[in-house]
Swiss-Prot record:
Keywords for this protein: Disulfide bond, Ion channel impairing toxin, Nematocyst, Neurotoxin, Potassium channel impairing toxin, Secreted, Signal, Toxin, Voltage-gated potassium channel impairing toxin
Chief location of this protein within or outside the cell: secreted
Similarity section: Belongs to the sea anemone type 1 potassium channel toxin family. Type 1b subfamily.
Signal sequence region: 1-20
Region (Crucial for binding to potassium channels): 68-69
Residue intervals passing through the bilayer: none
Compartments (UniProt record): Secreted; Nematocyst
Stated name of the protein: U-actitoxin-Avd9a
Length: 80
């Protein structure tokens, strides 16, 4: 009887540990690291938005604050 209780306890502990690890990535904790990896892996260094838009973004400082502009104005923001 004691062996069965111990086995159930160990299995529950393993389940809790696995669930806790998985939950950390779902909350977006690693979002910034993933974005940096994506920026580094892209081959083409182009601006997807019009040149005027990207220049305004750089002047306004949105290259540092906005992921949207950081990805779509890579060349103007100096990320590649």
């Amino acid at each position: 009887m004691n062996l069965k209780v111990l086995a159930v306890f160990v299995l529950c502990a393993i389940l809790v540990v696995v669930t806790a690890e998985r939950r950390g990535t779902e909350t977006g904790v690693y979002k910034k690291d993933t974005l940096q990896d994506l920026i580094k892996r892209t081959r083409n260094c182009i601006d997807r938005f019009p040149t005027g838009t990207c220049k305004q973004v750089k002047k306004g400082g949105s290259c540092k604050n906005s992921d949207k502009y950081r990805m779509n104005c890579r060349k103007t923001c100096g990320l590649c």
